[in-house]
């Protein structure tokens, strides 16, 4: 399909669609990011240990992966517009349920539902972006990933204060409000002609020869790249605040440090969206981002308190750039927006299942060693491996089918 001939939204409709994409993105991480700063309260109230508590991050991330692998039949049945809407509603309902079902079982169940909702949006929204903005795809994806990081930053910064005002369960449940608001904005914005999906029968039957991604080694190579890059994000999202609380910092301080780091991630996302068009070879920006993240992880081990602010800045800039770059790298491999959406679902499916293991492994290390330093060091090795794999994706190389 020639994307240049696809219907382009008017300026007003395009801005509204970008606003809707941004609003949806803001809701993809708060249900997880708000947990870390409140983890000691949650553990005290429910009796959870570190391994069980890690499931509040591990399960949503794993469900994102499982949901992504199932997204093609869901898209055939629901369509992109309804699928994204369902995702936002599920996130809202899961957050709201935490005000009522605040025991261990209820929190774990809500984590699963959050993961399904996030999976729907993360697999389908980029397809809409690529169709509606074919010539500005990298820029709009930068806006999208900036929204993801921004939502996490706000959730981390406000968690402790909200918990003091309405309790930890209420602080988690309040994130239902922006999720439902995003659903309303999406209902309006997704009516733009360029946001409409192609005929579902065409999707089901296929309009061009396809080779299953599981038969293409290049597609498999993208899975650990996204998985390891996302592992760094999920690891710090889950365990950075408890790491600082364990070292004697207050809950509010730990939350603000996570917020500062995610604020740096927002800045990185903005920079990627502004400048990625100048780098058709994604390897250079990726290597720079990994280097920043490695220095930040080293700082967490060596100088976590005395140099906390620069450590958060470096870590956030690195991880915040790695995340959108991995998505853009994957979407670069196929021109057709529907087929590229299928690729992203495949890559996110395996990648997020890999990423779900990092918070769980860190919880195990914390229970056994009462320290998370080893988790940061292992993550650093993972990022080095990811960077080496990225080097094989040179511009002009063979694309996927």
Region roles according to the model:
Residues 334-372, 379:
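A late C-terminal transmembrane helix in Major Facilitator Superfamily
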Residues 120-133, 321-335:
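Intracellular juxtamembrane helix-capping segments at the cytosolic ends
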Residues 110-147:
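Cytoplasmic helix-loop-helix junction between adjacent transmembrane helices
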Residues 47, 79, 100-105, 134, ...:
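Helix-breaking motifs and short loop linkers at transmembrane-helix boundaries and internal kinks
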Residues 35-36, 217-269:
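Extracytoplasmic gate region of multi-pass secondary transporters
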Residues 135-136, 143-194:
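Helix-loop-helix hairpin linking two adjacent transmembrane segments in secondary transporters
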Residues 67-79, 268-281:
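Helix-to-loop junctions at the C-terminal end of transmembrane segments
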Residues 66-105:
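Conserved MFS/SLC helix-loop-helix module at the cytosolic interface between two early adjacent transmembrane helices
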